[in-house]
């Protein structure tokens, strides 16, 4: 959908609500919609899973099309990595984030630094996935906000050519949201517990899970 079509669609929605919505500016609302493209973690998981399937097919066709998964343990770290990658390479294509179990155990547990043996909190990794995507969505909102300001400046200057160029860039904007491969520890209980943890991670936005059991001994009752 074009930038103008987004505005027109929003104008129709506002008009259909009558006078209570009259103070809402259609273009401002359309911009907020573009800055908040992903509403839920499942929206992200579906979007990134499609990317990953395409990248796997591209690699099968030619191994030169490999992907790179960069480890991170904090939303800000992931955000700055993707901002830097996009600025340097001009794209985030075939660049993923990877959550390592040992890294999470060592750096993100409320109990402090721990070995990678199922000793950290069960929901630590899902919480980190959600945190990462919050920061990546913020990077999108910031960059699009700068583009909107540039568009307003071009219009005020009467530079129709520059305004059109910026509109085209907005319509073809590449998000900082990339696939996350998450290391899931199956050592927290039985198969159902592993299923529930995997479900939680997908709901947070992960599109690929690496499942392993790092427990050092048998969990027993009594």
Feature locations, PLM:
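Alpha/beta enzyme core
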Residues: 2-222
């Amino acid at each position: 959908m074009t930038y103008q079509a987004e505005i027109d669609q929003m104008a129709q929605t506002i008009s259909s609500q009558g006078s209570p919505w009259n103070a809402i500016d259609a273009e401002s609302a359309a911009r907020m919609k573009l800055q908040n493209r992903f509403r839920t973690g499942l929206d992200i998981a579906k979007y990134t899973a499609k990317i990953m399937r395409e990248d796997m097919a591209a690699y099968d066709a030619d191994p030169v099309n490999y992907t790179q998964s960069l480890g991170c343990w904090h939303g800000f770290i992931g955000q700055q990595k993707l901002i830097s990658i996009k600025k340097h390479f001009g794209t985030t294509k075939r660049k993923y984030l990877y959550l390592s179990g040992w890294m999470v155990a060592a750096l993100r547990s409320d109990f402090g630094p721990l070995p990678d043996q199922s000793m950290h909190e069960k929901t630590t990794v899902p919480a980190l996935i959600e945190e990462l995507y919050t920061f990546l969505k913020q990077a999108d909102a910031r960059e699009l906000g700068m583009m909107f300001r540039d568009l307003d400046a071009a219009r005020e200057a009467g530079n129709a050519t520059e305004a059109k160029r910026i509109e085209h860039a907005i319509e073809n904007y590449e998000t900082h949201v990339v696939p996350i491969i998450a290391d899931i520890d199956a050592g927290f209980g039985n198969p159902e517990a592993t299923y529930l943890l995997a479900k939680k991670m997908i709901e947070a936005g992960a599109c690929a899970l690496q499942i392993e059991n790092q427990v050092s001994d048998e969990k027993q009752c009594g």
